[in-house]
A protein has these predicted regions:
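Extracellular carbohydrate recognition and processing domains
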Residues: 1-3
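Serine-esterase "nucleophile elbow" of acetyl-processing enzymes
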Residues: 5, 12-76, 91-103
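Acidic/histidine-rich helix-loop elements
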Residues: 48-53, 73-87, 114-122
């Protein structure tokens, strides 16, 4: 099993207990098909992280939602709109998506790296075209696409002012 490759995902639930002193006596899991699922697609700024101190908004989001909403965080560090498709991550989401679900999308951090030609997504054309695919596929299934603006990197110019690290990408 390779967690970095959607082709290796299966329909099994894996539960990891991180403390050597933790104990689990029993667990009962039942499918809740009647609740909306909020799917998350994105990069390291959204993905679930194994250990702190860094956390992403994607892994904290469930704390702020009312009961009765499932969250499926499919984000992965290093992903772009292009590589998320190539790794079949969007296919994984779409295979589980139903009417009334949500698709939250936050990309840009890696898309904007022109030094990564295999994953670079040009802001004025390709980036928008990929977003249109994600949006159309979610809508085709009766889900609600939600575009989340990428947070700015902390980059300072010579005058000590923070600069826009995602210049040219939609906000």
């Amino acid at each position: 099993f390779d967690a970095g490759n959607a082709r290796d995902w299966d329909d099994k639930l894996t539960i990891e207990v991180g403390s050597p002193h933790a104990a689990l006596r029993s667990i009962e899991i039942s499918r809740a098909d009647d609740v909306p699922t909020l799917f998350i697609a994105g990069d390291s700024t959204v993905t679930d992280r194994d250990s702190g101190p860094d956390v992403s908004w994607g892994q904290l989001l469930p704390r702020f939602l009312k009961p009765g909403i499932a969250v499926a965080n499919n984000a992965q560090s290093g992903e772009t709109l292009k590589t998320f498709l190539a790794a079949l991550r969007l296919d994984k989401i779409l295979s589980q998506m139903k009417a009334g679900d949500y698709l939250f999308m936050q990309f840009t951090h890696n898309d904007s790296k022109a030094s990564w030609p295999q994953s670079y997504v040009e802001p004025e054309t390709t980036f928008k075209a990929y977003l249109e695919v994600y949006i159309a596929e979610a809508r085709r299934r009766g889900a609600y696409p939600v575009l989340v603006t990428a947070m700015n990197r902390v980059n300072f110019n010579a005058e000590g002012k923070n600069t826009n690290s995602h210049d040219g990408y939609p906000e």
